[in-house]
Amino acid sequence: MLDDLFRIIKICLSAGSATTQTDKPMASTFSHWPHSNFDLGSAYVPLPETVLNDLMADEVQDISTLTSDWATELMNDRLYSGNGFFILDGSSYKELDPDQRIHLTKRLAPCLGKPIVHHSKHLKQDLVTNVKDAGVRFTSSKDQNFSSSNQEAIEHTESTELPNPIGAFLLHNIQPAYKGGANRFVNAYTLLDRLAEIDPANIDVLRRPFFFDTARGERVESPIVSYDDQGNLDFRWMYAFIENGRPYTKHWDDQVQSVIDATLSTMEELRITVTLARGDIIVVNNRMMLHARDAFENHPDHPPRWLLRTWFK
């Protein structure tokens, strides 16, 4: 009889702890990452010699099953259920020249996921796109094209102006800047944990629909915080576009402004900085990681900063 009673209590407790997608708690395995036990060194992954040889083979040669399985496992373990990013250690292939690195990236990208090609008024993304300072300089926080400038890129997620933002992206550091240019990251799970601690109502506000406007004729309405069909976090953030869309976001009031301000200030508290060495390849989960970049300088006597970028579905 007591066994039956305990079984009933267990069932009731299990039912009470179940949550719907709408009520999904912010607490996660990433709670207060990276300020507790996060080790940046754990994000680095060597490129096995067999995989490197496969990637450097002729472009018409099929990728081996070994390489495909290695890449799939890496994405599953590190990107979708791990820290939200990983770095292929460039010292594993430091002897490669730029053309060889482009070749490697073009061979590697389809192994990691489904690359996206996207051309719009805001940007051009090919299978592999060059990221260099093209002389663009911002005159307003509402007019930003981070990949074409040497100015600071504040925390954001990629492709927020699209109805369905990208799932991940790759950056291959061909040439570091003469000075500056470090990358910054914020884990969105940790960010939401912290905001919920301040006031649970903060999360309710971020779940409302906001307009993201590029000021170039591209505008989409979406919550900042949502979840996919599998319950995975989908965090969308580009402060400039949210500000551009403010006139169309009819629910914007003092409370919304307070939450936006709190989100910005909390991001600053949770940043980690990653300085990519020549050859390092970083792959980032765009739905759970915000990224940014410090301002940088090129120099006439130093090769200019140059990265390769790939987007993934």
PLM feature segments, named:
Residues 6-75, 79-86, 94-95, 126-313:
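Active-site environment of non-heme Fe oxygenases that use a 2-His-1-carboxylate facial triad
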Residues 81-128:
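Long, mid-chain structured domain cores
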